[in-house]
Amino acid sequence: MEQTVLVPPGPDSFNFFTRESLAAIERRIAEEKAKNPKPDKKDDDENGPKPNSDLEAGKNLPFIYGDIPPEMVSEPLEDLDPYYINKKTFIVLNKGKAIFRFSATSALYILTPFNPLRKIAIKILVHSLFSMLIMCTILTNCVFMTMSNPPDWTKNVEYTFTGIYTFESLIKIIARGFCLEDFTFLRDPWNWLDFTVITFAYVTEFVDLGNVSALRTFRVLRALKTISVIPGLKTIVGALIQSVKKLSDVMILTVFCLSVFALIGLQLFMGNLRNKCVQWPPTNASLEEHSIEKNVTTDYNGTLVNETVFEFDWKSYIQDSRYHYFLEGVLDALLCGNSSDAGQCPEGYMCVKAGRNPNYGYTSFDTFSWAFLSLFRLMTQDFWENLYQLTLRAAGKTYMIFFVLVIFLGSFYLINLILAVVAMAYEEQNQATLEEAEQKEAEFQQMLEQLKKQQEAAQQAAAATASEHSREPSAAGRLSDSSSEASKLSSKSAKERRNRRKKRKQKEQSGGEEKDDDEFHKSESEDSIRRKGFRFSIEGNRLTYEKRYSSPHQSLLSIRGSLFSPRRNSRTSLFSFRGRAKDVGSENDFADDEHSTFEDNESRRDSLFVPRRHGERRNSNLSQTSRSSRMLAGLPANGKMHSTVDCNGVVSLVGGPSVPTSPVGQLLPEVIIDKPATDDNGTTTETEMRKRRSSSFHVSMDFLEDPSQRQRAMSIASILTNTVEELEESRQKCPPCWYKFSNIFLIWDCSPYWLKVKHIVNLVVMDPFVDLAITICIVLNTLFMAMEHYPMTEHFNHVLTVGNLVFTGIFTAEMFLKIIAMDPYYYFQEGWNIFDGFIVTLSLVELGLANVEGLSVLRSFRLLRVFKLAKSWPTLNMLIKIIGNSVGALGNLTLVLAIIVFIFAVVGMQLFGKSYKDCVCKIATDCKLPRWHMNDFFHSFLIVFRVLCGEWIETMWDCMEVAGQAMCLTVFMMVMVIRNLVVLNLFLALLLSSFSADNLAATDDDNEMNNLQIAVDRMHKGVAYVKRKIYEFIQQSFVRKQKILDEIKPLDDLNNRKDNCTSNHTTEIGKDLDCLKDVNGTTSGIGTGSSVEKYIIDESDYMSFINNPSLTVTVPIAVGESDFENLNTEDFSSESDLEESKEKLNESSSSSEGSTVDIGAPAEEQPVMEPEETLEPEACFTEGCVQRFKCCQISVEEGRGKQWWNLRRTCFRIVEHNWFETFIVFMILLSSGALAFEDIYIDQRKTIKTMLEYADKVFTYIFILEMLLKWVAYGYQTYFTNAWCWLDFLIVDVSLVSLTANALGYSELGAIKSLRTLRALRPLRALSRFEGMRVVVNALLGAIPSIMNVLLVCLIFWLIFSIMGVNLFAGKFYHCVNTTTGDTFEITEVNNHSDCLKLIERNETARWKNVKVNFDNVGFGYLSLLQVATFKGWMDIMYAAVDSRNVELQPKYEESLYMYLYFVIFIIFGSFFTLNLFIGVIIDNFNQQKKKFGGQDIFMTEEQKKYYNAMKKLGSKKPQKPIPRPGNKFQGMVFDFVTRQVFDISIMILICLNMVTMMVETDDQSDYVTSILSRINLVFIVLFTGECVLKLISLRHYYFTIGWNIFDFVVVILSIVGMFLAELIEKYFVSPTLFRVIRLARIGRILRLIKGAKGIRTLLFALMMSLPALFNIGLLLFLVMFIYAIFGMSNFAYVKREVGIDDMFNFETFGNSMICLFQITTSAGWDGLLAPILNSKPPDCDPNKVNPGSSVKGDCGNPSVGIFFFVSYIIISFLVVVNMYIAVILENFSVATEESAEPLSEDDFEMFYEVWEKFDPDATQFMEFEKLSQFAAALEPPLNLPQPNKLQLIAMDLPMVSGDRIHCLDILFAFTKRVLGESGEMDALRIQMEERFMASNPSKVSYQPITTTLKRKQEEVSAVIIQRAYRRHLLKRTVKQASFTYNKNKLKGGANLLVKEDMIIDRINENSITEKTDLTMSTAACPPSYDRVTKPIVEKHEQEGKDEKAKGK
């Protein structure tokens, strides 16, 4: 991080912005221009300074700057951000310290920054009241907009609003300027909105533009202005827009997939949905009506006669809807189909294509656009069961396959991909926030350093007084300003956080403490407590600490000293430090913090806190041996120091027993001091010092090393404390007089007698048992409330009323006693108490108002008592916290959502309200407004809310019918898209932020052991004690031998202790049981000799601790290591056994220092493995059995025993044989298959029935035989300890029982019949036999505990809504119906129950009946809520609720309209939150399990992973032999043409065009269009045939070696055949056009060529990766469906056909059952299937109805079985399957994105080999060195090396074989290494990869490299140098000789010649120097040598190489 320029913080940094400042800025700008006339913009953006993110406009001023001097508020100041130092800007700060940045240029060219008008405008603009005014205006405006027909006077109000907005804009424009400079009005996009709104307001006023209501909708945008006014919302909207960008790839993929599916749908179902059942033959009346008169001239024997003939008009007849067959109460005619498995018409009707499509004609596949809409609806799963049923009815049941594909691939996959992308985006955003926080922390530390330097002197001056202050509470506030300044800064934000928390938790939660009187008088005010201690709190960013730094190994062990502590429960804990002379390598200064080393987590650096970790124990209630221990100098002398860590991870060291152990403060475990084991001079090494520096703010040795340092530490601490107090006093929420008042009136401690009373009451009320009793009362009270039902007897009602009174009394008493015990002031300091008080008050108010009508709602508040359970139930607590957190965290998002809902509701009302009123007859037969309309704001809001719930299609049909298609589609689609983004974002954010692994795992150790656990613990101890006493008594009376007793005693002690500690996961330190470790990590022996004293800190230790820092500390070991809980103490037969097991314990203890569980032993966490396959059977019986019954012990050495043993071994071999297993699996499948035949028609098929009966017997015998064999082979012990065997055993038992019953003739008994249905479980046996399914099941079983926990919490949560529903609606859903028409009577005819009874007496057609799913009791309430939560069947429940009036009264249309809100609230909290919570839990769980069984990559660095993955891909590929180019010239030309990329791409374009022509087809196109399309199709067929022929010519027989080519060939052949035989094929097979659709798959090939499609490739890659896992889940789902289908057939085959059950969708046959179950897998339409099953008695059904062809009578259902069947199926399929689906996809998506982010991907290697093929046509795997340069240039990035690349290639040092050839892998390795960078760890991986390559390519020529490119170059260079040196030598010689002779001859010219000689030699030297540089360059570029691929032992091969060379020559 580059050093940020730090402005001196504090008030000195503010300067007024004056004319001089402006001049200075201008001067700087001029200087910069002079220096740098042409600024390079791009460069500046990349590397230049960036604006400081903390000083952005709109943010608050960082607190480091201190307070703004009052005279500077709202005045122009110089810019603080160094970035703007040479830009013309200034800032203004308002009272709230918000930063406003303005341009310093003249606004509107006339107003300079110093103009008084502009100054006033700025003051107004920055004032908080201004934004408040605007906010209020907007809200009022919104209220006016919701009026559907506003009165006339509102017109004037409109003008007022417009005026205010105009005023606002003018102020902004005057203050900021209009648009030219930065920070002017129009530079802010939010102001565009204002501008548009105002412009429109004036335009519509003065210009008449026609449709006013459409324009009025523009005013709605004003609501969006709220976003620009509230600061937090802008960022949220920004984030949403970002996530939309991220989603672009998924959107494209989704649209593409939908188009493909829509095309398939278009081809398959075009026109099918118009098939109707038309009456045929027509009746006489209809014949006459549809006859046309025709004048025909006929020739009678030559005479022409004119006749009128009546001809039947077929077309008009079939279009007449009167002759269509309608089911009663349905708007559309019944569909039918002409294939055998489609819907059939009743007698007297025939199936004809006529009339319009269903649902006003909007549901169809007739054109591409409607098909697309249908598919989109399928994907969003809205009312898709309707589409599914219509299509299957019209086309046939086989087409279920189409829906399965679309639902699984389209719906689940794509929608979850959107989820995955949003989750990733969110995760990245979080990461960014974290990094930013870390950076802030670092910057903050820098600033602190600066402050420290400035204030060092002041601090030293204050040191003397400071040490007094820490002892004298009254001396607060005498410090010098500067030092208080420092600490103010350093602790302010932490204080802010603490103050925020203080609202809730100010005092200690005194529950469960038995205190001595002197220990803590409540009367001491908090200030005095605070002054007794000192706290360090340094700014830490909340986010950083609370998030993900947990490791599974980090549970600290707390030691409970019950045996020797005077006060067991006082919790103390201690910091202690260890001198590091001996073990420098240790990880950091806290011995117990091994796994979260501060050095790793940047964010934690320099802040003194101990991180809270997952699984940490917070209660170390170690005994306190002495109260008056001596402390560090300057610490309070009243006792030990506590260190508490608050929820932000800030450590506070707090003095003495007067500490409030608040539930938030987390106590650190006791850390124990050993006498120093190091040399006493306390030397520290240099690395140690460095470590200290890096974590300077831990309480580390620095503080304790020498006295002066220590003194300073203390003084700093006290300075901090005092300032903290001042700060708190200055920040107290109320004026001081209130505090005085509360001290006098709210703290009651006037008389000592009262104090005694108080003390006694305190002892009673705070006792854990009282808490337990209260909890039991809460549960009972909840039960009482849940027992209300309708109709209730008087007596029962009375019991409930009395019960309520009693409970109210109990809770009131509890409250008053607590107030007495704690004083009102402290009582109301705690959240739970306030909550209790609120509820109690409400209950009392309710009792007072019991008889007032209409206040029954108050009763619902009693339900809140259920939440008191959260106090002692961690998961519920967590859920409430999560909901609380997320409501907080998502406050802004929720607000955005609310604004959006509001806007759309108003838009809908303005646009469509009028249409709904005018065209209502189109959608309602009685011309009354339907329930869902947009005529007023409330209904409009409900429609938008319903769309947000995902139910948009039905309301959209209505809207399209009344208001036109285009507008409705636009509005609804917008709501849908925004819904998906925002709602998904919302809930994902919620889940991800609230669900870090710690949340779930840390549930069991919340804050401290809660009172319930303490109470239960005591009960356990009591029971154990009583047991022991009885046992001892028995021993003494009956057993004389004292010896036995002696042995038993220690065991019981141990047992007893074990009970004590295991409940709390802690190991006890007993007199003879110290399971603690000393420094070396060994466990001390557990003899009686070792004493505990060693571990308890002696008083004198404190001093030695200070004077000699080289102390060692022993830390409690972690839970994982204490195997004491796991020792089976019952098995100890004697002392020696005990010793042995303790030794075992020692061995198994961890050897890691300071300890957490050893990483090396993952055995504890691995799944239970199947027993290994030994060839010897195991023992038959357990050892217990053998000891009891001696007869079970047989010697296997001789006689019968030996025969028995041999028999067992034979059986064992049989059972273990593969064939046996295969045979059994085959039998299981057959017997399961047999069950599918037992349907409604079995009685008519006698032969099949007989066969099945015999088969059943055979199967049963086989399975019994298998079971017996396994018993003999494995023995009972092994067989019955395996869960899968138990499953087999139980299923065999069921068959056996029913077989026996049949033989005895009891087959008709009810019990036996119901047993027979259990045969449906047979397929479960297949589970253990199929690996894939078993994996899924195991994963699920792992998730069950947490799923159950959440399920329970959800049930509690729903219970509240259910009881509330019972209170609101019980008995009010009854209504009087006309049984003939099914209509409800109007209120005018029937007002109440008695009226209805009178009607019934008069005629039989009326009936007083209830809605089937209602709120008459809590059970039905749950069912209703489930229907509401799944949005299936919720309409009827809601309508009934909204119409209800009172018990026994006839309902009236929308009487209690606002009951809708009950459902809205439930959907938000009950449905969205809880269901998403499930998804969260499941995903979280899978992640945890993955971590648990995590693969090898946990132990790899990121770099290694990248390299490893690259290599992994490498190893699997090998160069393919390309198709040889044909020798023939013509063929060769064609070959070149066909293999070019352009050819491929043009074919792709043709495919796409072909698709477009297919899209154009419609069902009712004219013959002309049909003929044109068929011609176009002909052209395409010709073109594709041409492609096929060309490829065949050029590729010859190689054409058929490529899969795609075969596919193309088949499609072409089919198309040609299809042209001629179209009629025939369509009649018998699928339309041939379908094959063309499959061609679209070829587009997948083109994706590789497009650079931009990387994202889409990643998504498809993720799909490919998820397929195996998804297949397993699918298999499991099929199994579940199969079992449920069988079960459904045996139970519901004969129910009455109504609502969702009809002739096609029923449980009569296996196929139909599967069709129904597939539909409810997505919970679609389950209410319809359940409704008929709820009929249990006449008149709803007829129990005596005869079913033809079967002996079963009646068509009644079994409600309890039905409800269980559907609810369990929905839970299993929804939770399990759908969520596992999500987990798998999220997982693979993240893997895929990681892969795509890697520097080298699969595609790069493919590209390498594709290019390779061109250079190595014969696939020799070698390439000549000359070609290498071209090859490297031909590759694409990142592997390519652009030319000139000779030197780089030489530098790569590639091994060459004879003929200067290089192997492809060597090249690829070298290039890969170049991309990934060098790393020393790669060699091992590399060898691995080479081995893998050798294995996969046995063809690899084993070759012997002779040399390498570098060596070759070096050889060449050496040769050249030698040559040149020799030549030079020769030249010199000749020159010398010549000159010598010459000299002889001509001495005169000698000098001249010498000069020449020198010149020549220089010239030569120059040449050789260039050669040298060449050489140095090539070696310089050379990274460490690249070894060969098959790297043999180098020396050996070099020798061999030389020999070969010699041979070669």
Curated annotation (Swiss-Prot):
Residues 495-506 have a biased composition (Basic residues). It is a multi-pass membrane protein. One of its GO terms (molecular function) is voltage-gated monoatomic ion channel activity involved in regulation of presynaptic membrane potential. Residues 28-48, 507-528, 593-607, 1988-2009 have a biased composition (Basic and acidic residues). Pore-forming subunit of Nav1.1, a voltage-gated sodium (Nav) channel that directly mediates the depolarizing phase of action potentials in excitable membranes. Navs, also called VGSCs (voltage-gated sodium channels) or VDSCs (voltage-dependent sodium channels), operate by switching between closed and open conformations depending on the voltage difference across the membrane. In the open conformation they allow Na(+) ions to selectively pass through the pore, along their electrochemical gradient. Glycans are attached at residues 211, 284, 295, 301, 306, 338, 1378, 1392, 1403. Residues 1561-1571 are annotated as: S1-S2 loop of repeat IV. Residues 147-152, 206-213, 270-369, 385-397, 788-797, 850-854, 913-938, 953-965, 1238-1250, 1305-1313, 1370-1415, 1434-1457, 1561-1571, 1624-1636, 1689-1711, 1727-1759 are extracellular. This is Sodium channel protein type 1 subunit alpha. CDD domains: Na_channel_gate. GO terms for biological process: adult walking behavior; cardiac muscle cell action potential involved in contraction; detection of mechanical stimulus involved in sensory perception of pain; determination of adult lifespan; establishment of localization in cell; membrane depolarization during action potential; nerve development; neuromuscular process controlling posture. Residues 1915-1944 form the IQ domain. Belongs to the sodium channel (TC 1.A.1.10) family. Nav1.1/SCN1A subfamily. The Nav1.1 voltage-gated sodium channel consists of an ion-conducting alpha subunit SCN1A which is functional on its own regulated by one or more beta-1 (SCN1B), beta-2 (SCN2B), beta-3 (SCN3B) and beta-4 (SCN4B) subunits. SCN1B and SCN3B are non-covalently associated with SCN1A. SCN2B and SCN4B are disulfide-linked to SCN1A. SCN1B regulates both the expression at the plasma membrane and the voltage dependence of Nav1.1 inactivation. SCN3B and SCN4B reduce Nav1.1 conductance. Probably interacts with TMEM233; modulates the gating properties of NaV1.1. Residues 1-128, 178-188, 236-245, 424-768, 821-830, 875-891, 993-1218, 1277-1278, 1333-1345, 1484-1541, 1594-1601, 1656-1665, 1789-2009 are cytoplasmic. The lineage of its organism: Eukaryota, Metazoa, Chordata, Craniata, Vertebrata. Residues 1619-1636 are annotated as: S3b-S4 loop of repeat IV. Activated by the spider toxins Hm1a and Hm1b (H.maculata, AC P60992 and AC P0DOC5) eliciting acute pain and mechanical allodynia. Inhibited by the conotoxin GVIIJ. The gene is Scn1a. The chain crosses the membrane at residues 129-146, 153-177, 189-205, 214-235, 246-269, 398-423, 769-787, 798-820, 831-849, 855-874, 892-912, 966-992, 1219-1237, 1251-1276, 1279-1304, 1314-1332, 1346-1369, 1458-1483, 1542-1560, 1572-1593, 1602-1623, 1637-1655, 1666-1688, 1760-1788.
